[in-house]
């Protein structure tokens, strides 16, 4: 379904279909696509369409690859228009994960993507001798942009363990190909460490890792660093609309900085922390929305002007005393409103406190789920925690915690966990509800985290699950 939404959003004119999609049969999928996406004028099918397809209705627009090739290679190249190419031309449409709605098509240029690769290459000191294990999907900016562009710049090898994430296959590839680096989102590292073959896998060749894509509690980063082990673990922050990363740790940063911040801005990026609704810059060290401008910034959400204007905004205050000023040509700078809440410390490190839309308001108090998740994961029995707002008649919202127990551990009581949270946090930040993965015999609570296509834990799915639990 997510793939269909992406196709609808792009409104393509030609679609090339392989002999079969993963898990699906083309004879069933293509008629659905043809019906839902009227913009498609021609299907080019890499298969024997006469044998397998009834070419009636929507599929009458189909042609085999061989026929399409013979029809179009006969054209005289001299008659084709000569189109100049600019570094700022769109080269890739990358889709956001779509966890909160229809995936948005992000238009990125040669300039965006290759500068991202150059940043990663310089920061990690990658060389042509490196072998990168990349279990992150290529439809995600982490895989497509960070993985491919940085390896292209460095000349390093890429190992793609499996067509979808598989912890066992990833560990096999690390040992088989003597990988020197491993990339992933937090849930991937957690799943790899929990895999039964982890302790038996030779991981001695790994020199560094890159972790990004979701909240990263300090306790989790400490576990990953020591378990693999990873001499250099680079934590990063970014988003698809910024050509992936805008901040990254440096290997000379202290362990405390590497486990509690998302690093500093890359060169040629500028950022502010502002009030979400007004765009007014907040005092240094105070929380607000992180807005970014720079050479990784997308040009638009393709064919979505309204969404583009909502995300990329001008700030008149830039021209006021103390503002960042105009661009070299005198025009106002466009800022990408990221939706992430955070602040800069006195040394310029970015500290993420959560997603603005994930904030829970309990009795008038704004509560960041990430703060409580970080505390819960410090408990010796908990591998991973997710905090969700639960509708409540008295307080508006209460706190609910979904938890994953560490293998071989005894499950603590709800009261013990509340006391544990209150040792470091305010009393009202202790969750009222606790749910453990796989704890319901009726199957209402799954044994594994619901995830987006890019491997992140899906909080919208957890919110929907709460409705059936209360």
Positions of PLM-derived features:
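Gly/Ser/Thr-rich phosphate-binding loop
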Residues: 60, 66-69, 179-184, 193-258, ...
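Conserved beta-loop-beta connector loops within the AMP-binding
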Residues: 272-291, 322-328, 346-347, 410-414, ...
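Conserved ATP/PPi-binding loop(s) of AMP-dependent carboxylate-activating enzymes
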Residues: 264-268, 280-323, 365-367
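Conserved AMP-binding A3 loop
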Residues: 84, 91-115
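Conserved AMP-binding/adenylation subdomain of ANL enzymes
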Residues: 114-131, 139-181, 191, 195-196
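ANL superfamily adenylate-forming
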Residues: 17, 21-87, 468
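AMP-binding/adenylate-forming catalytic core of the ANL superfamily
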Residues: 3-8, 13-19, 182, 294, ...
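AMP-binding/adenylate-forming catalytic domain of the ANL superfamily
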Residues: 46, 426-456
């Amino acid at each position: 379904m997510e793939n269909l939404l992406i196709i609808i959003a792009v409104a393509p004119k030609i679609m090339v279909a392989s002999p079969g999609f993963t898990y699906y049969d083309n004879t069933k999928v293509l008629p659905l696509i043809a019906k839902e996406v009227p913009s498609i004028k021609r299907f080019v099918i890499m298969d024997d369409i006469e044998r397998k397809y009834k070419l009636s209705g929507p599929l009458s627009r189909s042609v085999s690859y061989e026929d399409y090739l013979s029809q179009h290679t006969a054209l005289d190249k001299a008659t084709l228009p000569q189109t100049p190419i600019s570094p700022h031309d769109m080269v890739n449409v990358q889709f956001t994960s779509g966890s909160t709605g229809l995936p948005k098509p992000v238009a990125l240029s040669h300039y965006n993507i290759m500068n991202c690769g150059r940043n990663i290459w310089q920061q990690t000191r990658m060389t042509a001798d490196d072998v990168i294990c990349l279990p992150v999907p290529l439809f995600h900016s982490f895989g497509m942009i960070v993985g491919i562009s940085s390896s292209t710049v460095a000349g390093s090898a890429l190992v793609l363990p499996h067509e979808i994430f598989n912890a066992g296959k990833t560990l096999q590839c690390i040992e088989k190909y003597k990988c020197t680096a491993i990339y992933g989102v937090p849930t991937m590292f957690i799943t790899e460490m929990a895999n039964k073959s982890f302790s038996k896998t030779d991981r001695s060749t790994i020199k560094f890792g890159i972790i990004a894509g979701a909240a990263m509690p300090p306790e989790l980063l400490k576990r990953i660093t020591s378990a693999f082990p990873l001499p250099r673990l680079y934590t990063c922050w970014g988003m698809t609309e910024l050509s992936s990363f805008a901040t990254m740790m440096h290997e000379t940063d202290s362990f405390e900085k590497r486990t509690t911040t998302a690093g500093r801005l890359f060169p040629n990026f500028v950022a502010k922390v502002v009030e979400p609704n007004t765009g007014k810059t907040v005092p240094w060290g105070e929380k607000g929305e992180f807005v970014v401008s720079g050479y990784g910034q997308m040009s638009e959400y393709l064919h979505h002007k309204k969404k583009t204007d909502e995300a990329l905004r001008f700030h008149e205050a830039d021209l006021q005393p103390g503002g960042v000023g105009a661009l070299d040509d005198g025009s106002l700078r466009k800022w990408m409103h990221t939706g992430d809440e955070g602040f800069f410390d006195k040394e310029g490190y970015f500290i993420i406190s959560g997603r603005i839309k994930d904030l829970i308001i309990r009795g008038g108090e704004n509560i960041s789920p990430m703060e409580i998740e970080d505390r819960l994961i410090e408990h010796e029995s908990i591998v991973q925690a997710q905090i969700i707002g639960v509708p409540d008649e008295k307080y508006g919202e209460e706190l609910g915690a979904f938890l994953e127990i560490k293998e071989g551990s005894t499950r603590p009581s709800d009261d013990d966990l509340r006391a544990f949270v209150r040792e470091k946090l305010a009393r009202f930040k202790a969750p009222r509800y606790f749910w453990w993965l796989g704890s319901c015999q009726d199957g209402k609570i799954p044994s594994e985290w619901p995830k987006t296509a890019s491997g992140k834990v899906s909080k919208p799915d957890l919110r929907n699950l709460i409705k059936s639990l209360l």
